[in-house]
Design a protein with these regions (language model features):
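Sec-dependent N-terminal signal peptides
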Residues: 4-13
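Extracytoplasmic metal-acquisition and chelation regions
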Residues: 17-303
Length: 303
């Protein structure tokens, strides 16, 4: 009986050791939203770390918990993943870690919106909506997204020390690219007489603060064809900016009155490449956002 017990214990230990070695060999990291996916893909480029988004390009952040509860969502990849990278501290609907942990108790959570290092430099600038709720769109700030990349890079380097040098190199490159996007906008708008806009959403507050754009908020539901002129006059601006489309007749009226209507990407809905989330979707989107802003600001300044 003792011999049988010893054999069983030996087999159990051997199995656990083999599973642990397999887990350590894996270099799979999971994300769920565009901004974080782009950050992690960029800072792990040319390494053997595998980065996956559990969602394709058709899942909006607005879906919240229902997206994770979807019976068709395949979370089997979490079983052998080493870590998830989320922003749960600022976005209450980020259930990535919770659902991944149900599949894998050993999985590590890296929250790109919060550093446990105690380094004040990595503390993100946070804003609230007018109703008091936290504004989760922290990645719309250039400064914040660089900090998010640093937070993720630090933790990934700890998990995969053999990749630390390439992560550091990629982090430098990514940070420089983000700074270039911001500086490109600032250089092109430096001599403009007015940087004032009418914001139809609070989701762009981080971006406007970073770029020193003076904005007055107007509820998009309160904008009508009849009051466009009055809103322009009241806010001393003809540039309307939102993160989603409004009625075509209102857009036509804005343009008829010599104004501009812009839709900027907050990455609520991911960008697509071959049906999947675009690894460079965030960078592409921010470049396009800056191009739209520059064009609108310059055209209004000439009038």
């Amino acid at each position: 009986m003792k011999k049988i017990t010893f054999i069983l214990m030996f087999l159990l230990i051997g199995t656990m050791y083999a599973e642990n070695r397999t887990f350590k060999k894996n270099k799979k990291v999971l994300t769920s939203i565009q901004s974080v996916y782009s950050i992690v893909k960029n800072i792990t480029k040319d390494s053997d770390i595998e980065v996956y988004s559990i969602f394709d390009s058709d899942v909006s952040m607005d879906y919240g918990k229902s997206a994770f509860d979807n019976k068709d969502l395949d979370l089997s990849s979490a079983k052998d993943a080493v870590a998830v990278v989320d922003v749960a501290k600022v976005w209450n609907n980020d259930y990535l870690y919770e659902y991944a942990r149900r599949k894998n108790i050993r999985i590590v959570e890296i929250d790109a919106s919060y550093s446990f290092s105690g380094n004040d430099y990595l503390s993100l600038s946070l804003l609230n909506y007018k109703n008091g709720d936290r504004n989760p769109y922290v990645w719309m700030s250039f400064q914040n997204v660089i900090k998010m990349a640093n937070i993720a890079a630090d933790d990934l380097s700890e998990l995969f020390p053999e990749n630390s040098k390439i992560i550091e190199k990629n982090l430098t490159k990514f940070s420089q690219e983000i700074k270039e996007i911001e500086n490109g906008y600032l250089e092109k708008t430096l001599t403009l007489s007015s940087l004032s806009v009418i914001a139809l959403t609070e989701n762009l507050d981080y971006l406007f603060n970073d770029l020193n754009i003076f904005f007055n908020y107007t509820d998009s539901n309160e904008v009508t064809v009849k009051n466009v002129s009055e809103i322009m006059k009241r806010n001393n601006s003809k540039i309307f900016i939102s993160d989603r489309w409004i009625k075509k007749e209102i857009i036509n009226e804005i343009e008829k009155k010599g104004g501009k209507f812009l839709v900027l990407d907050t990455f609520n809905i991911p960008r697509e490449v071959d049906g999947k989330m675009d690894p460079d979707g965030y960078i592409k989107g921010m470049k396009e956002n800056m191009e739209k802003l520059v064009e609108a600001m310059q055209s209004m300044d000439k009038k």
